[in-house]
A protein has these predicted regions:
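Short, solvent-exposed loop/turn segments at secondary-structure junctions
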Residues: 38-42, 107-108, 136-139, 188-191, ...
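N-terminal "arm"/small-domain region of PLP-dependent enzymes with the aminotransferase-like
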Residues: 1-74, 85, 89, 211-213
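A structural signal for well-ordered alpha-helical scaffolds and beta->alpha junctions
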Residues: 16, 47, 75-80, 201, ...
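Conserved core of the PLP fold type I
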Residues: 65-211, 216-238, 242
């Protein structure tokens, strides 16, 4: 038996698959110490909250509705409206439900986005994903349908007291050319925990606008939720930014709920990809998120 080129690429060893296998083994091996990637910590108070919430949703029938029905390919309609309203009210963003799509985890969201904006084009050109900082998240490395889809830039390193240091974007040497299809940065960065400053993010946004390409922000750990961030950082979104969020680091990795906030053209593309690849995103995570927003608990 032989595979296609697609099969050859996606059946070979990958760092992120090994990481997830190690994570699974670690969860089921008492006493294992996770020195690599890990399952989000199970905080007893959060587990109690989720158990209570799910029990109430079962009692009311909302959990059954979520499990026994498809949502549309854009995601749960109720959540799209509630989340857009919350972000308008809390952050002042000019955002509507048509600016949001859900995916089966943010990992699949980045697979969609990388291959939407990078790779071969109809005119014969090839675009790449630019990471303005390195190191970056290992899960990006094998997400391209084509080889050599990614290019990264060497950072400036600021030396701090007591042996600490901080990564910064080296804007003087950052190259954005015709071959650049999108800029991508995680904030905070996985695995270093580095947080790109507000000024750096604004500069990247300006450069992306100048070159007519999107700035994609991986916000899995960031603000406004789940807020696992310990420095000053302001949430940023506009129609040229693609902001990717997740319920995983909120404590619900098993819900596989990714959130993409973008302009309507991108959301329409993601919706179509969802329909073709997975019919629709899973419903239980979005149903829980609806209840958290209604109770004013999501940002608490």
């Amino acid at each position: 038996m032989t595979f296609s080129l697609f099969g050859d690429k996606f059946t070979r060893h990958s760092g992120i698959t090994r990481l997830m296998e190690d994570l699974n083994d670690g969860l089921r091996t008492p006493g294992a110490i996770m020195l690599g990637g890990g399952n989000p910590a199970q905080i007893p108070e959060m587990n109690t909250y989720f158990q209570t919430l799910l029990a109430q949703m079962l009692e009311s029938g909302k959990a059954t509705d979520a499990l026994c029905n498809y949502d549309g390919p854009q995601g749960k309609t109720e959540l799209l409206a509630l989340l857009a309203e919350m972000l308008r009210d809390e952050l002042g963003w000019d955002i509507e439900p048509q600016n949001i799509a859900l995916t089966n985890g943010s990992q699949s969201a980045f697979f969609y986005l990388f291959n939407l904006f990078a790779g071969r084009r109809a005119d014969g050109t090839t675009k790449k994903v630019l990471f303005p900082l390195a190191p970056e998240y290992i899960g990006y490395a094998d997400s391209g349908l084509e080889e050599d889809l990614f290019v990264s830039a060497r950072p400036n390193i600021e030396l701090l007291p007591e042996g600490q240091f901080k990564y910064h974007v080296d804007f003087e040497h950052l190259h954005i050319g015709e071959e650049t299809g999108m800029i991508c940065v995680s904030r905070p960065t996985n695995p270093t925990g580095n947080v790109i400053t507000d000024d750096e993010l604004m500069k990247l946004d300006a450069l992306a606008n100048q070159h007519g390409i999107p700035l994609v922000i991986d916000n899995a750990y960031g603000v406004p939720f789940p807020g696992i961030i310990f420095s000053d950082a302001r949430p940023l979104w506009n129609p040229n930014i693609v902001l990717c969020m997740s319920l995983s680091k909120l404590g619900l990795p098993g819900s596989r709920c990714g959130i993409i906030i973008a302009n309507e053209k991108i959301i329409t593309a993601i919706t179509n990809m969802n329909g073709i690849i997975s019919l629709s995103p899973g419903g239980i995570g979005p149903a829980m998120m609806c209840e958290m927003i209604k109770r004013n608990d999501l940002l608490r």
